[in-house]
């Protein structure tokens, strides 16, 4: 942390105002300092927020995902535990926090071995196969650069070698390892061990030399006990060979040290293994009541892990450079053992320890090259190399004031800062309380606004419902009026048609009566003419008789004529009487007809009224019947829909079941064909071997049989 150099003037001018913006920038992300369980920070991950990867009685692995594809894992192995072989998908840079153990890995097709101790830093390259055996309880912190996933699902930082091997089919493995099928069957059928197991080997007797390769293969991938046996069977690495070197932060001299603390940085110049890597390592130990001066890293992001004690961290948000009027310009939070905090590149920071405990943390920087942190205060302050007049103008102060400000601090990098952390914590608590108060006020304000909005919405909804109800009532009223008008119009039309029909019937009856009267008059005229003709005939006969009898019958003739005239008069009177009777009879019939018509009209009106009532009753019954039929139809449609869905679901299940059965049958047939092919190949190989053996060793003649 003490390796620094002076950057160009233009860079420092950008950060002069930044240092004095002291408020939190978490306002941008809507969060507050996270030592309170109810809050979180984008730059802080608490110990209990880690993601569990592996958890067994022999150890555990938890992880933290950092932005930009950085992945940190916390690996803990109990004494005499074994982390099973893994294939790295990315570079792995790690730091040993506590304990000891053995790291084994494959390097250029040869197996390498490295003793791990507290404080060791080392790197394994991408594509390396490794495993770890702990002696004492071992705690390792590792960082991986997993980047963006190119496959779905993501492979992660590493894969189990056992899973990779068993991903191939039996035929491929049998051909590759040249082992019998029963050996591979044992591998397939064995229970998968957890990633961390107990490394105690079980008691065993050495078998034949020809069985060693078989047992080794099985023990590598079958069970926990057999994996640990593999460790016992390995040949010991020649100690005279050159070992890979680690860098131990506790054995090397620190880069900076004074009474307030010390710091050390590990980069590619200190550790050859870091060459080509994207990570460096650093460690800081602050004594009680100390502080690392405000500074920033211009070339790398710093991902830190608290190893011991508690402390306060303040990070300034560079996005607030444009104006210090923003009341959220920096973020302060409290960290404790096991927490992870991140400081992005170019973000000024300061770490402080409390007066009652020291503060120790290590971390990874996202660059293996030598970093040059830039300090704003102390003997190494970048402000000292700037023109004092420019600095004075920048702060709007006099040169003497700036001179006193820059010369007051005699220390550099790590300073004594009594009660700084406590003051920062108190300020943070006040900020949190104030933020909580503002949030509660904001919540109350929003609640009131929502309540008012809800009331307005309810009032608006009631008005809309009332308007809708009135509109529906108006529509219903208009509909009823239209229906009544339509009924009245129909009734009027029916009455007009009925009146027209009755008028037509009346006219028809009058016409019939007139025709009957005319026929009667014609008949009477015809009778009168016939009577006249008959009288004329009789008269002519009488005249003939009278002519024949002349004188003697003259008197009788006159008498006869008188008598006939009398009779004619009587007949006429009789006919007039009959006509009068007929007229009276017709008048009586007409009166009776009118009475009957009036009665018929009243009966028809009564029948029409009853028919209208019956029609209305039928309409009501028809509407009720249609309503019942509609409800029954809807119920039937719902039941049909449910039955159809059930039928489709059963069809899909049947199709899926048939597909699975066919797939299982296909796989079974494929497996049988492969087994038959393997058997045929094995028989051919055995026959070839027998033939080769026969050609190599011809049959010996049999000894003569004893007699």
Swiss-Prot record:
Record bears the keyword Cell membrane: no
Keyword Glycoprotein belongs to the record: yes
Residue ranges, annotated region (Disordered): 439-707
Positions glycosylated per UniProt: 60, 203, 285, 356, 396, 399
SMART domains cross-referenced by the UniProt entry: Cupin_1
Xref: Pfam families: Cupin_1 (PF00190)
Name this polypeptide is given: Vicilin-like seed storage protein At2g18540
């Amino acid at each position: 942390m003490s390796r620094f150099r002076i950057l160009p003037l233009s860079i420092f001018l950008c950060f002069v105002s930044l240092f004095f913006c002291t408020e939190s920038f978490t306002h941008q992300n809507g969060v507050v300092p996270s030592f309170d369980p109810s809050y979180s920070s984008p730059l802080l991950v608490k110990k209990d927020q880690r993601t569990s990867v592996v958890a067994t009685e022999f150890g555990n692995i938890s992880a933290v995902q950092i932005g930009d594809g950085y992945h940190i894992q916390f690996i803990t192995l109990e004494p005499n535990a074994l982390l099973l072989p893994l294939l790295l998908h990315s570079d792995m840079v790690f730091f040993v926090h506590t304990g000891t153990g053995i790291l084994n890995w494959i390097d250029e097709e040869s197996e390498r071995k490295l003793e791990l101790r507290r404080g060791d830093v080392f790197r394994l390259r991408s594509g390396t196969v490794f495993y770890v055996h702990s002696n004492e309880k071992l705690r390792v912190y590792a960082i991986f650069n997993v980047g963006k996933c190119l496959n779905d699902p993501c492979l992660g930082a590493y894969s189990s070698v056992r899973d990779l091997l068993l991903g191939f089919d039996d035929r491929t493995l049998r051909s590759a390892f040249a082992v019998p099928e029963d050996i591979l069957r044992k591998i397939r059928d064995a229970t998968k061990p957890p990633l961390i197991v107990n490394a105690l080997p079980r008691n065993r007797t050495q078998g034949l030399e020809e069985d060693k390769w078989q047992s080794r293969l099985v023990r590598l991938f079958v069970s926990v006990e057999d994996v640990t046996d593999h460790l016992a069977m390995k040949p010991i690495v020649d100690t005279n060979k050159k070992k890979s070197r680690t860098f131990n932060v506790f054995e090397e001299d620190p880069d900076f040290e004074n009474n307030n603390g010390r710091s050390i940085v590990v980069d590619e110049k200190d550790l050859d293994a870091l060459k080509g890597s994207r990570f460096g390592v650093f460690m800081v130990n602050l004594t009680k009541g100390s502080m690392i001066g405000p500074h920033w890293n211009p070339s790398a992001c710093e991902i830190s892990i608290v190893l011991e004690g508690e402390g306060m961290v303040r990070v300034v948000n560079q996005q607030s450079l444009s104006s210090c009027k923003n009341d959220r310009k920096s973020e302060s939070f409290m960290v404790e053992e096991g927490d992870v905090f991140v400081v992005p590149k170019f973000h000024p920071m300061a770490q402080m320890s409390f007066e009652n405990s020291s503060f120790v943390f290590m971390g990874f920087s996202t660059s293996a090259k030598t970093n040059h942190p830039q300090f704003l205060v102390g003997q190494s302050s970048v402000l000292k190399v700037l023109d004092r007049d420019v600095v004075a103008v920048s702060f709007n102060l006099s040169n003497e004031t700036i001179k006193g400000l820059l010369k007051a601090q005699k220390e550099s990098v790590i300073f004594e800062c009594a009660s700084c952390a406590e003051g920062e914590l108190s300020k943070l608590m006040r900020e949190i309380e104030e933020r909580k108060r503002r949030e509660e006020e904001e919540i109350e304000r929003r609640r009131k606004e929502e309540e008012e909005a809800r009331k307005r919405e309810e009032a608006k909804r009631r008005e809309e419902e009332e308007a809708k109800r009135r509109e529906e009532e108006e529509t219903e009223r208009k509909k009823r009026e239209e229906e009544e008008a339509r009924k009245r119009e129909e009734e009027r039309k029916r009455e007009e048609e009925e009146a027209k029909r009755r008028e037509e019937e009346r006219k028809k009856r009058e016409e019939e009566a007139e025709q009957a009267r005319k026929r009667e008059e014609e008949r009477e005229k015809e009778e009168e003419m016939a009577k006249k003709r008959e009288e004329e005939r009789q008269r002519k006969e009488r005249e003939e008789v009278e002519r024949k009898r002349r004188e003697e019958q003259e008197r009788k003739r006159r008498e006869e004529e008188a008598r006939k005239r009398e009779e004619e008069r009587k007949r006429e009177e009789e006919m007039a009487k009959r006509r009068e009777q007929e007229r009276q009879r017709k008048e009586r019939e007409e009166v009776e007809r009118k009475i009957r018509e009036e009665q018929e009209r009243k009966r028809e009106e009564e029948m029409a009224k009853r028919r209208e009532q019956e029609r209305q009753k039928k309409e009501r019954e028809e509407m009720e019947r249609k309503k019942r039929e509609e409800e029954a139809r809807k119920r039937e449609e719902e039941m049909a829909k449910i039955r159809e869905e059930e039928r489709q679901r059963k069809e899909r299940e049947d199709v899926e079941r048939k597909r699975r059965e066919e797939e299982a049958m296909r796989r079974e047939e494929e497996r049988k064909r492969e087994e038959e092919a393997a058997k045929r190949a094995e028989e051919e190989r055995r026959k070839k071997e027998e033939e080769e053996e026969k050609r190599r060793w011809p049959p010996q003649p049999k000894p003569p049989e004893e007699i």
